Swiss-Prot record:
It catalyses: a tRNA precursor + 2 CTP + ATP = a tRNA with a 3' CCA end + 3 diphosphate; a tRNA with a 3' CCA end + 2 CTP + ATP = a tRNA with a 3' CCACCA end + 3 diphosphate. Gene3D superfamilies: Beta Polymerase, domain 2, cca-adding enzyme, domain 2. This is Multifunctional CCA protein. Its EC number is 2.7.7.72, 3.1.3.-, 3.1.4.-. Belongs to the tRNA nucleotidyltransferase/poly(A) polymerase family. Bacterial CCA-adding enzyme type 1 subfamily. Mg(2+) binds at E21, D23. GO terms for molecular function: ATP binding; CCA tRNA nucleotidyltransferase activity; cyclic-nucleotide phosphodiesterase activity; magnesium ion binding; phosphatase activity; tRNA binding. Keywords: ATP-binding, Hydrolase, Magnesium, Metal-binding, Multifunctional enzyme, Nickel, Nucleotide-binding, Nucleotidyltransferase, RNA repair, RNA-binding, Transferase, tRNA processing. GO terms for biological process: RNA repair; tRNA 3'-terminal CCA addition. Monomer. Can also form homodimers and oligomers. ATP binds at G8, R11, R91, R137, R140. It comes from Pectobacterium carotovorum subsp. carotovorum (strain PC1).
């Protein structure tokens, strides 16, 4: 029985990146051998075991044969005679098909180390096309390693395009699509993930609402990049600079979906695109089973991001209505999330990347002023029932009016 460290742990250590989890392959053993040593079997479809002390995953060397559609249609063969090279051959990318012995020696039959050094994402074999999930995985790795200069090999991109064209992606479950997308949103370059999906034809299949934005023009005065799809990718890249939160990045991705509904004869203007986009956000999130908190923020951002751009000229009553609409009294974190998504929208434009966004600080300060007026103070003054809310609104409106009167003339700068 021989044990090898494989996959991401080897890859990341060679790249000088932190290793967060370790996966091992066991060659020349049976399930009974591992169970006798105290390992716990956890894989139903695959022979995967947990180490009795470290709880790392140990998998028996295996081969896989395509038996149906999608990423679950495989027959797995695990036996003591399966070699390490056979096990590595079934993996997606050469950079993930490197093994390390217990003595520290590298085993690299498919030249993954060379591709690491050349910053290339390349499939190991044509068996890559048997698993449609790998299209998303490659897009995610492209996003994760974009800052290191990694590019997808031409032959790998051609294979991904073929898979998208032949309809294999239709067999992916919503949960798997969202899981890969969520991981990609957490990388330093989430926009690259969606760009790769578009380049291979997968975006139109999995995210048609986003794909529809390409070719939709916006006024050149406000959007020098003109194309709404390009603007969306620029805003996602900006959101990644501004916030590590998946919620903020996903909401930014969805903020302009309504522009895809504008009739061409009305281009390049998109009046009312915010509220119009809410239904598209809802549909996308339901289809991919996006968690409710992420969905709810995305819907609010779609509806209110344009209003936040004009926050400096809003009347106190309108400001309070905005705070009520986003439920910021019970969920104060939403204020910062909306401020950041709106800033990403404003700065995610050609030539505006380093432009200040004073609306964000104005929104934060307005909320601070309004929240200093508490319902406890109103109750202490003897108000009861519905009168508490009415008086609270009146006092907050007055507080905002007094504060607003002390601000510089916003119309001159907005």
């Amino acid at each position: 029985m021989k044990i090898y460290l494989v996959g991401g742990a080897v890859r990341d250590s060679l790249l000088g990146l932190p290793v967060t989890e370790k996966d091992w392959v066991v060659v020349g053993a049976t399930p009974e051998d591992l169970l006798a040593q105290g390992y716990q079997q956890v894989g139903k479809d695959f022979p995967v075991f947990l180490h009795p002390v470290s709880h790392d995953e140990y998998a028996l060397a295996r081969t896989e044969r395509k038996s149906g559609k999608g990423y679950t249609g495989f027959v797995c063969h695990a036996a003591p005679d399966v070699t390490l090279e056979q096990d590595l051959l079934r993996r997606d990318l050469t950079i993930n098909a490197i093994a390390r012995t217990e003595q520290g020696d590298l085993i690299d039959p498919y030249h993954g180390r060379r591709d690491l050094e050349n910053h290339v994402l390349r499939h190991v074999s044509d068996a890559f096309s048997e698993d449609p999930l790998r299209v998303l995985r490659v897009a995610r790795f492209a996003a994760r390693f974009a800052h290191l200069g990694f590019q997808i090999a031409e032959e790998t991109m051609a294979l991904m395009q073929k898979m998208a064209h032949e309809g294999e992606l239709a067999y992916l479950t919503p949960e798997r699509v969202w899981k890969e997308t969520e991981k990609a949103l957490g990388t330093s370059s989430p926009d690259v993930y969606f760009q790769v999906l578009r380049d291979c034809g997968a975006l139109a299949v999995l995210f048609p609402e986003i794909d529809n934005l390409y070719g939709v023009p916006a006024p050149a005065k406000w959007h020098p990049e003109i194309d709404t799809g390009i603007h969306t990718m620029m805003t996602v890249a900006m959101a990644a600079r501004l916030s590590p939160e998946i919620d903020v990045r996903f909401a930014t991705l969805c903020h302009d979906l309504g522009k895809g509904l504008t009739p061409p004869e009305l281009w390049p203007r998109h009046h009312g695109h915010g509220p119009a986009g809410v239904k598209l956000v809802e549909a996308l999130c339901q289809r991919l089973r996006v968690p409710n908190p992420i969905r709810d923020l995305a819907k609010l951002v779609a509806e209110y991001h344009d209003l936040i751009h004009t926050v400096q000229v809003l009347q106190p009553k309108t400001l309070l209505k905005l705070f009520d609409a986003i439920d910021v009294w019970r969920k104060p974190q939403r204020l910062e999330q909306l401020a950041l998504t709106s800033e990403a929208d404003a700065r995610g434009r050609a030539g505006f990347e380093d432009t200040p966004y004073p609306q964000g600080d104005y929104l934060r300060e307005a909320f601070r002023v309004a929240s200093q007026v508490s319902s406890a103070g109103v109750v202490a003054d003897g108000f009861k029932g519905i009168d508490v809310r009415n008086e609270l609104t009146r006092r907050r409106t007055q507080a905002l009016a007094d504060w607003k009167a002390q601000q510089p003339d916003a119309s001159a700068t907005s």
